[in-house]
């Protein structure tokens, strides 16, 4: 099983842009040295707790500081970008990383980002994402076209575009060609329509964990959509995000986790989000408890939501998750702000990669 890292980034709102930039590069280096496969970076323009508006800058800066880890924006919010500009930037950046780049796409799920870009809400965004990506795919194909869609317009020049003199067109398509670049899509709710759309296009799925039943539905939805279009689904492509904290003992891990950026993120930011999207019922059901979501506290999180404990305990929790949900190919650790006390966090990441995942029984 591989491990990945999702740098949302869940930062304290008081952090400066420079602090977040430096912290992001350090995390990328730590994950690369620990043997993580992927490093994914969120994109938001208005969220103080998730404040990285341009993940491509971090990807470009981290490229020469790392050796093996792959990078992805997770995700570029396509309705907020010019598709022609973004297609060229993505292709060029993938060439810089020479195979260590993949692409995440999404419509955008936060109303404040939508308002910033002139939309009253997020309702129309999915249709715009579809149109944007279709135009980007045509640009990467490097065949002449000119198209004005409902929301965007784009084209690609051909030999007859400027007949009075010869123009050599730069090849800013993805490294190794479009077919070599993985595209990934995230899913949050049960039977996610986003993952159905991803499966129909042979894009990879990333499941935001909301309980074993939701996780299973994410894979099943994606796999059924893949098969409906003649593709073969593989569990090795299925990624699942989890909050993870590892220490010598269960007690020490829980103590460190609750005092860390993980605890702060949940206490001040993620509790309302999980309640808004009704994600707690599935997790409570997994725990076998009869409690109301309003009763969920930090101790419940440490025991039932986070993969928290000694290496052996976390290994067991991952194996139970795999057994109950059907399994996945990559565990993706969610990022949290540990700028003020990074060493316990770095230790946890390193132990996950070296002591836990290599020993997980895949069933």
Curated annotation (Swiss-Prot):
Record SUPFAM superfamilies: Bacterial luciferase-like (SSF51679)
Enzyme class: oxidoreductase
Entry keyword Phosphoprotein: no
A Pfam family it matches: Bac_luciferase
Sequence intervals crossing the membrane: none
Catalyzed reaction equations: (1R,4R)-bornane-2,5-dione + FMNH2 + O2 = (1R,4R)-5-oxo-1,2-campholide + FMN + H2O + H(+)
Entry keyword set: Flavoprotein, FMN, Monooxygenase, Oxidoreductase, Plasmid
Amino acids binding FMN: 74, 186-194
Gene Ontology MF annotations: 2,5-diketocamphane 1,2-monooxygenase
Gene Ontology terms: cellular component: cytosol
UniProt EC number: 1.14.14.108
pH dependence: Optimum pH is 7.5.
Summary of the function given for this chain in its UniProt record: Involved in the degradation and assimilation of (+)-camphor, which allows P.putida strain NCIMB 10007 to grow on this enantiomer of camphor as the sole carbon source. Catalyzes the FMNH(2)-dependent lactonization of 2,5-diketocamphane via a Baeyer-Villiger oxidation to produce the unstable lactone 5-oxo-1,2-campholide with (R,R) configuration, that presumably undergoes spontaneous hydrolysis to form 2-oxo-Delta(3)-4,5,5-trimethylcyclopentenylacetate. Is also able to convert (+)-camphor and norcamphor to the corresponding lactone in vitro.
Protein name per UniProt: 2,5-diketocamphane 1,2-monooxygenase 1
Source organism of the structure: Pseudomonas putida
Lineage: Bacteria, Pseudomonadati, Pseudomonadota, Gammaproteobacteria, Pseudomonadales
């Amino acid at each position: 099983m591989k491990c990945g890292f999702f740098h949302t980034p869940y930062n304290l709102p008081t952090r400066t842009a420079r602090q977040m930039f430096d912290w992001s590069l350090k995390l990328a280096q730590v994950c690369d040295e620990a043997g993580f496969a992927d490093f994914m970076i969120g994109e938001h323009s208005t969220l103080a707790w998730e404040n990285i508006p341009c993940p491509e800058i971090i990807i470009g800066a981290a490229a020469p500081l790392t050796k093996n880890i792959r990078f992805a924006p997770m995700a570029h919010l396509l309705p907020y970008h010019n598709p022609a500009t973004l297609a060229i930037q993505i292709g060029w950046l993938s060439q810089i990383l020479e195979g260590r780049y993949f692409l995440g796409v999404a419509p955008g799920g936060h109303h404040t980002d939508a308002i910033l870009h002139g939309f009253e809400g997020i309702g129309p965004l999915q249709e715009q994402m579809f149109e944007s990506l279709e135009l980007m795919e045509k640009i990467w194909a490097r065949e002449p076209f000119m198209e004005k869609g409902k929301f965007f317009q784009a084209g690609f020049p051909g030999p007859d575009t400027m007949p009075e003199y010869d123009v050599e067109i730069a090849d800013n398509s993805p490294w190794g060609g479009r077919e070599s670049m993985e595209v990934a899509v995230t899913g949050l709710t049960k039977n996610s329509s986003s993952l159905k759309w991803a499966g129909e296009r042979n894009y990879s799925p990333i499941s935001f964990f909301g309980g074993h039943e939701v996780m299973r539905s994410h894979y099943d939805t994606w796999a059924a959509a893949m098969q409906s279009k003649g593709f073969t689904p593989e569990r090795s492509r299925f990624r699942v995000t989890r909050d993870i904290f590892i220490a010598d003992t269960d007690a020490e891990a829980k103590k460190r986790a609750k005092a860390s950026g993980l605890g702060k993120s949940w206490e001040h930011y993620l509790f309302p989000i999980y309640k808004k999207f009704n994600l707690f019922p599935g997790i409570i059901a997994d725990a076998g408890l009869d409690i109301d979501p309003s009763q969920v506290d930090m101790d419940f999180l440490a025991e039932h939501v986070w993969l928290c404990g000694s290496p052996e305990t976390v290994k067991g929790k991952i194996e139970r998750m795999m057994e109950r949900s059907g399994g996945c190919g990559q565990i993706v650790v969610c990022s949290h702000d540990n700028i003020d006390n990074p060493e316990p966090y770095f230790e946890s990441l390193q132990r996950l990669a070296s002591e836990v995942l290599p020993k997980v029984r895949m069933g």
